[in-house]
Regions:
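N-terminal small-domain helix-loop-helix segment of the aminotransferase-like
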Residues: 2-4, 9-100, 107
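Conserved core of the PLP fold type I
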Residues: 61-155
Length: 155
């Protein structure tokens, strides 16, 4: 049996498991429970998106791209932001594609938080903010918000 305290870094060992994982485990063992967690859509991926994926595979596009994203996708994101929001971003220098929201949040926090920096985290919030902040050596400062204030940070 592996003693994880001996092989994992202390910063990882000291991260508490998310309470939502326990909830998922409990709800998965119960009949008739409808999960409202994790933000999975309640519809299939649209056919044109699935077809584009199939076409890419058939064309042999199965290799790694640049670690910041495929050049064609980066340019399209830049064009979309210009068309929809009138914002200009340089696709080679100002856009990064990630595999999902959690990776994007992790990269952003790692890019701006230094050891010892305090990071204000309004609650309720996404479960990853606090552990990622701790992993980079930041100090989470939890601010509880209330429904009667529309969950806005107040004094």
């Amino acid at each position: 049996m592996i003693n994880y305290d001996e092989v994992l870094s202390s910063s990882v060992v000291n991260i508490k498991p998310s309470g939502i994982r326990k909830f998922f485990d409990i709800s998965a063992s119960m009949e008739g429970v409808i999960s409202l967690g994790v933000g999975e859509p309640d519809f299939q991926t649209p056919w044109q998106i699935r077809k584009a994926g199939i076409n890419s595979l058939q064309q042999g596009k199965t290799k790694y791209t640049s670690n910041k994203g495929n050049d064609v996708l980066l340019k399209e994101i830049s064009s979309y932001m210009q068309r929809k929001y009138h914002l200009n971003y340089n696709p080679k220098e100002q856009i990064l594609v990630t595999v999902g929201g959690s990776e994007a949040i992790d990269v952003a926090i790692r890019a701006i938080v230094n050891v010892g920096d305090e990071v204000i985290i309004p609650q309720p919030s996404y479960v990853c903010y606090e552990p990622i902040t701790r992993l980079v050596g930041g100090v989470p400062v939890i601010i509880n918000t209330k429904a009667e204030n529309d969950f806005k940070v107040t004094t």
